[in-house]
Amino acid sequence: MNFFEKTFHDYTIDELYDILLRDISIYDAGGGITFSGGEPLLQATQILPLLQKIKQKGISLAIETTLYAPIENYTIVYPYIDFWIIDLKFQYGFIRNKDYNINRMSFYMNLKALQQSTDQQYIIYRMVVMSEILDKIDIVAKKLCKYNIALIELLPCHSLAKNKYKELGKTFHQFGLPTMEELSICKEQLLQYSILSKSHSL
């Protein structure tokens, strides 16, 4: 296996725009376009021209993000986004790397800015649940309360990235997959903190 094998395709803004508009009938019926990960906020300047072109057509835009990106990036895309899907990382602690403190502060700033300027009905919070955190739900719940998050979607972890890790020559850490019963217990614990939740199966 060539670890440097190119597994993506480069597109110009106009090429992407033309591809997206193939589904114009869906958008006319009330559908929209979602930008997701990687982390789209880290490509804010690159996707900005595309966001602008799409909004000129009156198409609804959503973004799925961890909010771990510079506040400047958030500010760039904010005027064009109608719905926000926030992939919370509270179950891991915080993303730790050489920019740990910067990323942590950026998350705080972005979340605060978003909550202050966007009606809550346009924000969806999600969190992946693995067996390893089932005894730490109280800690997670307190953090959710701290950030005024009263409704969250719980997603059981999966191993869909396993083959990609193998292709890249990296070690894949398999977290424990929670059962539906364990997810139900998790939801009950969150409810004790007045946090409503719903779970999805993969």
Which role fits each region the language model picked out?
Residues 166-172:
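Peripheral (non-transmembrane) domains and long loops of multi-pass membrane proteins
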Residues 6-7, 37, 97, 173:
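Short, flexible active-site loop motifs that bind/organize anionic cofactors or intermediates
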Residues 17, 21-161, 166:
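Conserved AdoMet/S-adenosylmethionine-binding subsite of the radical SAM
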Residues 180-202:
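A C-terminal junction/extension of Radical SAM enzymes
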Residues 1-11:
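Canonical Radical SAM [4Fe-4S] cluster-binding loop centered on the CxxxCxxC motif
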